[in-house]
Regions:
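Sequence/structural signature of outer-membrane beta-barrel proteins
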Residues: 36-42, 73-75, 126, 140-144, ...
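Bacterial N-terminal signal peptides
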Residues: 7-16
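Residues that define the transmembrane beta-barrel architecture of outer-membrane proteins
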Residues: 27, 46-50, 74, 109-115, ...
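Short glycine/proline- and aromatic-enriched beta-strand/turn motifs that initiate or cap beta-hairpins
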Residues: 21-58, 64, 70, 214-231
């Protein structure tokens, strides 16, 4: 994934070096759809999915948009990921797991939905390339589904989640992002973007907040009237 991202970014940057005239055709609306890669290192969690957004170009340099993404992946919860209260509950059980030769890890599946809206600031001094930056602020909906791999872990999950194997949470995330678009034509382009965000979900189980990095690669379609001339 990283190699593909670097190759696409290098292609866009090389294109930028040959395109230094200002854009003269900027459509009023944009629709973007992309493959999404979401990494949360503190949980050793990698998720993949899709991202889509709608944008309104109020000015060549200013876009207002709404973004939605869905990502899914799996990993395992380890004791050091948990907050002190939850670790205290586990303390009497860990020696028993060790005697039985059972690793103290809970496999799980995770789904992450994000909803985001706000401004984007564009640099359009190159004819076929747009650089942009934006604040990241929105709502994150996380769904955790435990996948116990033996009866002992299943009982442990039931105890921690009050008889359930799944849990969900809604939290606010914040951060920043940016990227580059290769404007192949006034109505079609390729975009690479990345966002860095911070949030604190499942705080009654997990310790501290989380940082995640999202990378998206996809196509952008532009339509509506040409807004060049607005300042």
């Amino acid at each position: 994934m990283r190699r593909s991202f670097v190759c696409v970014l290098a292609l866009l940057l090389l294109t930028a070096l040959t395109c230094f005239s200002q854009q003269t055709d900027i459509r009023q609306f944009t629709v973007f759809g992309a493959f999404s890669y979401l990494s949360t290192p503190s949980l050793n969690l990698t998720q993949r999915g899709f991202d889509g957004d709608l944008g309104y170009n109020a000015r060549p340099w200013l876009t207002f948009g709404f973004d939605f993404s869905y990502n899914n992946g799996h990993s395992s919860v380890l004791p050091n990921y948990l907050n002190s209260a939850t670790q205290a509950k586990l303390a009497p059980i860990l020696p028993i797991l060790q005697e039985l030769g059972i690793p103290p890890a809970i496999p799980y599946n995770s789904s992450t939905y994000t909803y985001e809206g706000g401004p984007q600031f564009n640099y359009r001094r190159m004819q076929h390339v747009t650089l942009f930056a934006r604040p990241a602020l929105g709502l994150l909906h996380g769904v955790f589904s435990a996948k116990p791999n033996n009866p002992v872990i299943a009982e442990l999950v039931n105890g921690l989640l009050n008889g359930s194997t799944s849990k969900s949470d809604n939290v606010v995330f914040y951060g920043f992002g940016g990227g580059i678009t290769w404007e192949i034509t006034p109505k079609f382009g390729l975009r690479v973007a990345t966002d860095f965000v911070h949030y604190n979900y499942f705080s009654n189980l997990l310790s501290g907040g989380r940082n995640s990095v999202r990378v998206v690669v996809g196509t952008k379609f532009n339509f509506g009237k040409n807004i060049v001339g607005k300042k």
